[in-house]
Curated annotation (Swiss-Prot):
Keyword annotations of the record: Hydrolase, Nucleotidyltransferase, RNA-directed RNA polymerase, Transferase, Viral RNA replication
Its EC number(s): 2.7.7.48
Keyword Hydrolase belongs to the record: yes
TM ranges: none
GO molecular function, one term: hydrolase activity
Catalytic activity from the UniProt record: RNA(n) + a ribonucleoside 5'-triphosphate = RNA(n+1) + diphosphate
Protein name stated in the entry: RNA-directed RNA polymerase VP1
Amino acid sequence: MSLTSRYTHFVPDSTITEILNDSNTPQILLHYANIVNGSTPVHFTSHHDNQVNWTVATLTRMSQYMIPDFMKLFPPLEPTLSLQPDCHCSFINLPRPEIKIPIEILSPPKPNYAKYHYDATTSRVFVNSKHEMYMDNFDVSQLIRDVAAIKTDSPSGNITKGLLKTFHDSIKLRALSPIMSMFHSLLSYRCPCCTSLNGMKKLNHLCFQYSSIYAFLCDMVRPYMCVPFFVDRLGVQILPGFKVSSQYPLLFFEAIELMHTVGLGNLSDSLSGWCFYTWLDRARIGVFREMFNRRGSITMLKSRVVSTGTIFRFSQREFVIESITEQRSTDISPTFEECSFSDSQYIQDNCYKPIYDITTTLDDVKCRWLDVALNYFYGAVLYVTGPVSLALEQSGMGRPGSLNLQFGGTTDVYVEGRWITIDVEPVSPFVSRIKQLADRELAKTKVNGDSLEHGFFEAQTTNSAGNTKETLAGLRSEIIEQHDSPQEGRLLASMAGIRVIDAMRRFNTTFRDHTEFLNEVRRPTKAGMRYQQQRRPRVIQMTGTEAQLGGWLLLNVYEPTYKRLGYTSSGKNIGDIRDMQAVLEASGQNGINSSVDIIGMDASTQNTHVTLLGSAAIKAYNPERIGFPKMFFQSTHNGGDANSRVLPTRVTRDGQTIPKDDDVKYNLPQLAIIYSLHGMHGPTILYDGYFAPAVLTSQTVFRSGWYNTSSQHTMLGSLVLLSLEEDIRNGYKNPYDGAPERSLIAKHWHSIRIIGRVLGDDILLKAFGPPTLTPDELREVTAEVCAEFEHRMELLGFLCERAFSDVMCEFLKQKGFGGAPHMFPDRLVLYTSERGNQAMTNPTTMYRVCDALIIEFNSRSRNIFNTCVSRRVLQTVCSTFALRMTSSGHLVRRSYASRKPYSRVAKVSDGILSELHNHKTVFRIIDYNVLGDHIAMIFLPMLWATNHILGCPPPAIVSISGANIPAASPLTYPSAAITTFWLTATSRRKIDFDSSATAYKKSMSDISNLTAVPLDIIFSFSNAMELSPLSINLDKDYDIDTLRTFGFIVGIMSDSLFPTPSATRAKIKSPVVDDWSRYADSLLNPTRVRSSHHGSEILAESNVVVPYELRYAHRGTAKVRQSMYELPVTDLEYGENTMTTLTQLSESLKVKPGTSKLLRDAMLAGEVFVIPTTHPVTLPCPSFDAHGYGHIIPPNSLQSLLLTHLGLPVSSASYTSSFAKTILSDGKLPGSAEAYLSLYQETYKKGPSAVAYLKDAIGFSDSSMSALERLASNGLYGISGASFAYNPRGGFFFRFDQDNADRFGTSLSPSPTIRRLDIVHMMFTMLMYPTTMVSQNQWMMVRFGRSFSRLARR
């Protein structure tokens, strides 16, 4: 049975054959390539380009069997002299690798079962080496036969089955199918010659045919005459009848990932070919196994590149560049022999040796580019998968670290038959010093004992509660039996496994009794799995709700303490370059940088480490400080006996136990921490399903899923940095525990300054000495400081993995190189993912998932122009979706591959499909049959994602009036500026522009019907009176049919076109969910609830309506509803959503501005006329054209032009993403940042008292409210619709705030009354067309307040 007869998402082979047999197809693809490239305009007066787009979209839906026919029509070609094999930033004269697929891939060996060993004692399968856990190269067809031959259950049979599951799980799709992913990569690919043109010249060839990797792909397909694997609901499958290597799917996705990155300028074509060749070489044994075995040699080669390059060093402070100097690193440079390459001799001689030989003459551009390019040799652009149960020693088992901490005395309490240590007296002087610092610093932290119950509930998330399968199965049966409706019962049962619902259920049971609570603290919980790119798989030790109470209390004192100490860094809070401030400042200054990673910090954390800090936390909650507050356990507000508990206490010192005469009375927060220490290492069960249904993990490892896991590590690292800094400041007189002599620290202690940052197990350290030191002496001083820090961590029992460099440092996966950002494009995986739960959903979801990653390439790539190409191709690839119906017209939910009965969930209206069929200029539908079912493949219009909602950059356009509109830039954001593009392209007006004020005034007056009115009055009137809706007829002035034909109308309906689970489930009415919601609201702070109701009522009297879900009084309800929204879509919901989609498609054919508020509001965008202006732009900083700024801002590039004009961000500016991260996400608040900002703006107009009531209504703290006020006052980000269109990851380097906009605003308009919204609109328009709008430090734009825009140059 062929694939096309089984699967919905393939169009019939006959359809593809017809296209491939068409002699015009090569020209169609070339025409399409020029459209997405921006070098050929789309003609809005013709439907031809829509047809071209549908042809290409159809090809992306071909089956595996048709790929050889496509490759035959478009064979790989050798580059001619005009198509040089290397990109414009490459300098390595590498020949293209000879195509040679290893015989081990074409004829793989049999599976090696002998490396797997069964331990009958633990019922666990293990391997002898940590690298053996990864999937080897073997013949999958043989493995399938071996599994089919298993007749009885046995350990050896389980090993065989587990190995097959390992193969099934080796790839999880991101959003697109393998074939769609391949076509996206091919059509996005630009050869190095065309990359350098940035869309300025029309292409005369299809670039992918000249790719060396495409030649490899063709060679991989040829022996099978198809792509011999596919991915369905069960995972990766091979086609029957073929001998396929287990590494084939990994190599396929690695190939298309590398092809995609060539167009972005991160690899040259020849180097990408060699890179893929190395992965072929490694795949002979196993991709992931050899990746870890061989990465050491690549690290050595990268060290050679960095140590021999001469770079520009950017010395800066808070993003103000103080100096730019040329500098050569003094890092140690390894010899070629020391690199110890283990790849084949062919690769060593023809690839690594030429790279090594040219490293003696590396300038700034070459050095930075090559170091990034070698990252693709270091790690595969794939998620590292494998049975986590085989890697328990790495993350699921405890390890001793460098030593066990010794204590001369302990204080213990007796809890339920067990003595628990709650305080220690360390033997080591240094560990004693850390304990003293912990006691001192935590005692300074203010602890609030009020509303602890409410605070703990508000901290609950909508993640999994970590319950075991057995617990969930019993709970599920109990809930389903209680409900007559199976659908409601299943929904509620699924919700019960979510943390916030689980907590509500337990508050009335186990949280009422100490004994039951303690039993649950030590109950088994579930272990999760994490798969990451370039890193080994990990076990996540989840923690039950009872145990989380103590973790939350510890977090409450640790977090404010280490934030006050000032050594922490918040990671990706803002999302742009300001998150990198520490690494940029450190790497831009002279001296040694130490990037430290604690090896296995979770696994190395002992009970004693937790007690070391936990004892200080118990003291911080001392009754003398906070009394005996109410907190569960049937406690009361009046501080009765239920608010405390007396525990027998003893002291052990020098082996002697000394019982205390008086037992100690502990309050409930102290007891909760003690109980957590009691159950800190309860068992966790890993359900990975590979070689056994479940595996018990270690009971000694520190749980990675505890609330305070990260804060425990951060607190400890901060205290070590504090001890080091204080000891240096005090003269460094008494080194600890046999530390080597630090003579330079002792000599220069008075002038040494430390930069230290810590978060979790990541640490950055750099020291600065007096200016009198020579560079060599400064290196020695900083080396001593870093060595002393590592020594202190070892005294605590942790082993450090460090990287020393005088020009480079890394922290939180962010790297600074000579004071400039050094990004990691190799860590963006576009086509595969960790979970695969968003694969092949609907066009909007698929587009958004992939588009977010492609935009991220703007901040990590040299040639950001190609992100435009990639996003436009993505628009085409995601423009189709299929409906599968039975002969009776009922939708079918599951595919044939699931081997489960079909779920027929709704009946489709034949009338709607007929209506769509009749509008062939708007939609295309291909009908075919699969296993007796009817398939309708629906194609959306060409530019369906080019709108202010999805934000795809518009291509070049010839408008209906004949104006030429250039293609938009990679810095296009989903804003009204895109609507401006559509209105310009479909406007029936023709206006002749003239630079003279008289002609301009006449044009304005004629349009607005305000003749003989002075120009300045027109400006003032239009700004004040919203002239747009009064003076235009949208139906008459714009070609609505063109808006519909090319996809604008469908696009702006995308949110309702493909409903999200939250939109669907918001309509569900369930009495049980309502009861849960009321109970959740009752768990909130009653005082704040009353204030919330009062504030909402007062604001309502001023016509300010606080949305229900944003009110603090209903925050519990919001959590319950959110837990319902995040569950997977059910079959019934799928049917309802699909019917909504069809209905909305039908509605889009009837929409007009006069009948649709959505369309009318979208079309009332601002108007921008492009005319020359003589106002010079004041540059905020020196030109970056000469030096560039790191890897992704080459000299004389679009990025350097914009950075010169816009400048680097201001470190103190407040961004939307920062608010969303620190306030909404970390604070576990419902709603979006946009909703809070819009509400604040509306309230602000009513006066300060209204803002005070808003604070009460939404339940914000003083700090949260200040953050919201800063966000709103930041002008540009204070405008809803602009704030959230801007993506900091897309404009990573550029300053984009109100002050900067105002600086340009004075140049953009002759009107003194220009509105803030107008400035925002101009900024977004400028970012869409930067090369058009900025010319020799002058702008080419002026604003007038009407409803359409002219962006075309005369």
